[in-house]
Amino acid sequence: MSLVVRPMRDDESRSFLEIQRAAVRGLAAKDYPASVIDAWAPLPVTDTAVAFFRVNHDSEIRLVAELDGELVGIGALVLAESELRACYVVPDAARRGVGSALVAEIERLARHHRLTHLELLSSLTAEPFYRALDYEVEERVEHVLGSGGRMPAVKMRKTLHQGAALGG
């Protein structure tokens, strides 16, 4: 098994969104009603959605994960907000170390940029994953989706310790 985490290329915007939607629909559907899933991960991925996604590209460091040459995961870091913005893995690659590798690279980048902590808004589905990576629950909240719908979510935080991860 060959796992590579790398910066997203400009021509991978649609794939980034498709992975997010596949992860939400395949993994989070057990924890949320269909109305939330449809608002959170609308299909198909439209040209308008891709264009909107590209507008925000300067504010995020976006990563992709390749497993044996196939894109299977995505991640995003917003330095200005010390926020782990996204970590999604397609269902077929779940529980194979892809998400952990994405978070490790996001944390490495955050340390490199001298961030002292990371915050995130987790789905109910991903909360145990982040807990296993030493993120702590700050509070349970209702996240307002772009459609105006609401979904239960978990605000989490992790203190980052500077060290060997400061390289490259």
Question: What label would you give each PLM region?
Answer:
Residues 94-96:
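Glycine-rich ATP-binding loop(s) of histidine-kinase-like ATPases
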Residues 7-11, 18-92, 103-105, 109, ...:
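Acetyl-CoA-dependent GNAT
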Residues 149-168:
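Terminal substrate-recognition subdomain of acyl/acetyltransferases
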Residues 130, 135:
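Conserved active-site tyrosine of GNAT-family acetyltransferases
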Residues 102, 126-129:
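Conserved short alpha-helix immediately C-terminal to the canonical SAM/SAH-binding motif I
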Residues 2-4:
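Extreme N-terminal starter segment of soluble prokaryotic enzymes
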Residues 119-121, 136-155:
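Conserved catalytic-core motifs of GNAT/GCN5-like acyltransferases
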Residues 110-123:
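Conserved GNAT acetyl-CoA-binding A-motif
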